[in-house]
Regions:
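Catalytic His-Asp segment of secreted/periplasmic serine-dependent ester chemistry enzymes
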Residues: 185-245
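Serine-esterase "nucleophile elbow" of acetyl-processing enzymes
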Residues: 47-105, 110, 118, 230, ...
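Short catalytic/ligand-binding loop motif for oxyanion handling, primarily in non-cytosolic enzymes
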Residues: 77-80, 108-110, 135-141, 188-194
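Short hydrophobic segments within beta-strands
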Residues: 71, 131, 182-183
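A conserved mid-domain beta-alpha-beta active-site/ligand-binding segment of alpha/beta enzyme cores
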Residues: 138-177, 182-191
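Short, well-structured alpha-helical segments in soluble
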Residues: 113-124
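Surface-exposed cleft-lining segments at the edges of enzyme active sites
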Residues: 74-79, 102-104, 135, 147-166, ...
């Protein structure tokens, strides 16, 4: 990582997963999965290998000038999926361009926006692809905590959650400079039927602001854990991102 040697990367390290190697993770295990029959019948081999910064990705290349950056939560990490079938890897294959995955299990909109800001401020990338998380995920402002420990309890009735998501999207748009940013969202990111009208309001705002985005597809399949999406849905995301580039 020649280019990054002059940049302090401590801010973005996920301490708990630095160089971790495991075949199960979180709810992607027999003990914690959503459907044990599905888990046992899943035939694809899965390994979780994290790089020296704590992300499920290869180590950064020597030159990152032309790299595409992917930011998201556990769906972008690819929980329950083989690494090569995650949407960032599918985009990499389609574009024949290195995609660097900067995603965290449980990431909030604020965390995603902070990562985008760090990348823009330090690397001035050509392209960032974002998959925003659940509306109701919020982050503890206490920056002394590890990122993995900053998730706040979910309150589905907190009307400020939607405003928080919108504010973070607009923050990224306001600082992107020449970077092309494409936004999308995890399936059912609104996390409840009562938020469906808000999603429509959000899409209208993005359209009015000429922001590059696409609505999330319906989840067409499930990964080994019985919760996250698998190859059919990740392929839909990958195609949609590439089509907007």
């Amino acid at each position: 990582m020649v280019q990054s040697k002059l940049i302090n990367l401590d801010e973005i390290i996920l301490t708990r997963t630095v160089n971790e190697f495991t075949t199960t993770l979180g709810i992607d295990s027999f003990a914690h999965c959503q459907d044990r029959d599905h888990y046992n019948s899943y035939t694809k081999f899965i390994v979780y290998k994290f790089n020296e910064l704590g992300y499920r990705d290869e180590e950064w290349p020597e030159n990152i000038d032309n790299c595409v950056w992917a930011i998201g939560d556990s769906f972008t990490v690819g929980i329950g999926q083989p690494f090569e079938e995650t949407w960032p890897q599918l985009v990499q294959t389609k574009l024949q361009t290195r995609v660097i995955n900067i995603s965290m299990n449980g990431a909030s909109a604020t965390w995603i926006a902070r990562r985008a800001k760090f990348i823009i401020d330090n690397f001035n990338p050509k392209t960032i692809l974002i998959q925003w998380s659940y509306v109701h995920r919020r982050e503890d402002p206490d920056a002394s905590k590890l990122d993995e420990d900053r998730a706040l309890p979910v309150d589905p009735l907190d009307v400020a959650d939607f405003e928080n998501l919108t504010a973070n999207i607009m923050l990224v748009e306001s600082i992107k400079l020449s970077t092309v940013v494409i936004h999308s969202f995890i399936p059912k990111f609104f996390d409840g039927e009562n938020d469906l009208p808000k999603a429509t309001v959000l899409y209208n705002m993005l359209d009015t602001s000429n922001i590059l985005y696409f609505p999330p597809p319906d989840q067409a399949d499930v990964a080994r854990d019985g919760y996250h999406y698998d190859i059919l849905t990740s392929t839909h995301y990958a195609n949609s991102y590439v089509n907007l580039l």
